[in-house]
Amino acid sequence: GTSGKLFSQSLDEAVWAIDAARAFLVASVEMTLQERLQIEKGFLRPCADLLLSSRDKGNWQVWHNGGIIALGVALKNDSIINAALNKPDLGYYDMQKKNVYNDGWWNEGSVVYHFYPLRAILLSAEAVRCRHINLYDEKVINMFLSPVNMLYSDLMFPSQNDGWYGTTLLEQAGLYEIVALRTGNQKIIDVL
């Protein structure tokens, strides 16, 4: 048997699982049934089980949930997706409630630590679209708008808390493009 574990920490498992699940969905149309089942049973499901048992209270859990969601979509398993969204204290919705202020700022207090979980949130929102779940709510839109209010004229952000200088909005343009496409929010479009 296999454990679905490839890395030394659950954060790396989750980040990698998101890309692996997406790649599986693309490649699976060219696979035989036996090949698909081997990957599902030998990696995808064990990795989902591993991430479902991982617990964190901050940005790691957001990535865990993103990995679980991506794996649930790849496995076409709504109960896995539901756990990632609704698990008490750990699910997507509780993480948003606990960690995102009303103005859209992530509670770790730096731009760097704001965009890190925001990328996982965006990947989660994209993954569940195929299950007719819309995570592009006001809180997510505010997460994209709030950093814009503190930009320097050169599109750089100030260094805050344990973040670092040199972080720029240009690095995040791809995320903003997706949110603009999905929401049609004029303020997001204006940022671009």
Each language-model region and where it sits:
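C-terminal, helix-dominated tail/subdomain
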Residues: H132-L192
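Aromatic-lined, polymer-binding surfaces characteristic
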Residues: G1-L151
